[in-house]
Amino acid sequence: MPRRIVLSLAVAIAALLLGLVLLYAGYILMDAWMDLHAMPAAQTDTVDGNTISTVALEAKAAKVDSLSLDGAVMLDAMMDDLSSGGYTAACFDIKRADGTVGYASTLGTVAAAGAVSSPAGDLRSSCQKLGKNDLLVLGHIVCYPDNVQTAANPAWAVKSGKTAYTDPAGNRYLNPDSTEVYNYIRSLVEESVRAGVTVFVLEGTELPQAAGTFNHNGFADLSKRLTADLGQDVKFLQPVAVNITSTTTADLKKEVADKCTQNLNENQIYAITCPEKSRRAVKQLLDDRGCTCYLITE
């Protein structure tokens, strides 16, 4: 075979191989980009043409430690516990009542205040893994009680005279009328949404009467503003607090029947506090009553 033909074939084969390599690399990069930017499918679906913010949510949730969202061994153990207990959702702390943040936030305001504590180690991959196992992720935000940011940013605090208002238990509060406070809460939500969380339980939206009167106090106002800014694919739930103290079967049955009587709207969730040893029985009683949206914690 003439040398010119051999060289031409070699060049053609090399070009073909290079093209295949580049095509394969392109697919890998595209998959990586989609993993980085995609939201879990279970978190963004619509129901009968309605967005998640407008439908009644079915979530039988247990409160879990933020540390368990490590994307690895602790997450697997937590998912096993939820599945064996008949739960369909996990709820973790985004912002706690003391002002600490329960995930590895990169927000400058969080870092400057040193607010991160016992965080979820890998929130993004944990949300993806939970979604693949048909478990919904709920983010719990205690909105206005905050001893961390009120110390780091005194101008954000509710004032009593020239100093921060402090309740009898020593708690300070963020000012609901402050633009900076609203932007802070919104930033926490936005960052969590990017990691894969689309349902948020907003607690601590009402301030004590002694703290004063505010234009933007309350769940309805805050959730409306957040929905307007973030869109209809994010849902906000108002917790309806129920404290269960009984431990015997008969007493538990009566207490649950007496206290869980409210017909929840599409933006509410029962927030059940009960002794650890009663959790399984309380969950069964809620299921027997046809409750489909609740959060059980200790």
Where are the predicted features?
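Aromatic-lined carbohydrate-recognition surfaces of secreted/lumenal glycan-active proteins
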Residues: 136-146, 201-203, 218-252, 273-275, ...
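N-terminal, intrinsically disordered, polar/charged segments of Gram-positive cell-envelope systems
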Residues: 31-60
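Glycine-rich, aromatic-flanked loop segments that form ligand/cofactor-binding clefts
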Residues: 89-94, 119-165
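Catalytic domains of carbohydrate-active enzymes, especially glycoside hydrolases
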Residues: 73-101, 191-203, 258-271
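Aromatic-lined substrate-binding rim segments of carbohydrate-active enzymes
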Residues: 45, 96-141, 188, 207-234
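N-terminal Sec-pathway targeting helices
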Residues: 1-22
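Substrate-binding cleft of secreted/luminal carbohydrate-active enzymes
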Residues: 25-27, 31, 250-298
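Active-site-adjacent "subsite" loops/lids of carbohydrate-active enzymes
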Residues: 50-63, 144-190
